Design a protein with these regions (language model features):
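Non-heme di-metal
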Residues: 1-207
């Protein structure tokens, strides 16, 4: 965790506990785990966007910080949607009905948890998001170690190439080169998740 406060420790412990339960089902760092967890994790940004829209609508955004947070959450959401599409669509990580059912139902629960928490205590919601991304970094670093060279050296999937070609994508803004293999795609995703850790830490003190 980038944020070193008591509340951040509590947030990280909560997410670690949830992660340990999910590890029972999705224990390998593969496309199945990545696709399922991205559905769940991305929902947190969707919920934050909804809550920020509401707070802005009722007139609480006097300094423009809520709008800035909303725009950042939308940018992060788009990036996480790309991750989901890479592993769920291109690599067929959600081919099992059970994975789709479980991931999507957990995502609905996560949506309401994050939406309500954002309305009540945005700092805590952002710290929970930071903790989620800390765990995501671990997952993708494991993927680089646990997946076979054959898997990592396969060509970069179409979604990854389309995302890189967007001028405002995180990969282009950061200066990443166009990925040629899945190894390079995963390396860029590790950087994405690390950037989300920092962004969520900053959002925790935004308003």
């Amino acid at each position: 965790m980038e944020t070193q406060t008591r509340k951040a420790e509590v947030a990280h412990k909560l997410i670690e506990t949830g992660e340990s339960l999910l590890n029972i089902v999705w224990y390998r760092a593969d496309e199945r785990r990545a696709a399922s967890l991205e559905i769940i994790a991305r929902t947190a940004y969707t919920a934050e966007e909804s809550a920020c829209h509401y707070l802005e609508t009722i007139g609480l955004d006097r300094k423009g910080r809520i709008r800035e947070t909303l725009e950042l959450a939308c940018y992060q959401d788009t990036n996480e949607q790309t991750h989901e599409d890479i592993f769920a669509r291109d690599l067929n990580g959600l081919k099992n009905w059970g994975d789709r059912f479980l991931a999507r139902h957990i995502a609905v629960i996560i949506y309401w948890i994050f939406a309500i928490t954002t309305l009540i205590d945005h700092e805590l919601a952002a710290l929970l998001g930071e903790a989620v991304e800390v765990e995501a970094v671990k997952t993708y670093r494991r993927m680089l170690i646990e997946q076979s060279d054959e898997w990592l050296n396969q060509p970069a999937v179409p979604t990854a190439l389309r995302y890189w070609n967007k001028p405002n994508s995180m990969w282009r803004v950061r200066g990443d080169r166009q990925p040629a293999s899945m190894r390079e795609v995963v390396e860029s995703i590790v950087k994405d998740e690390s950037d989300h850790v920092h962004a969520n830490a900053q959002k925790a003190i935004a308003f």
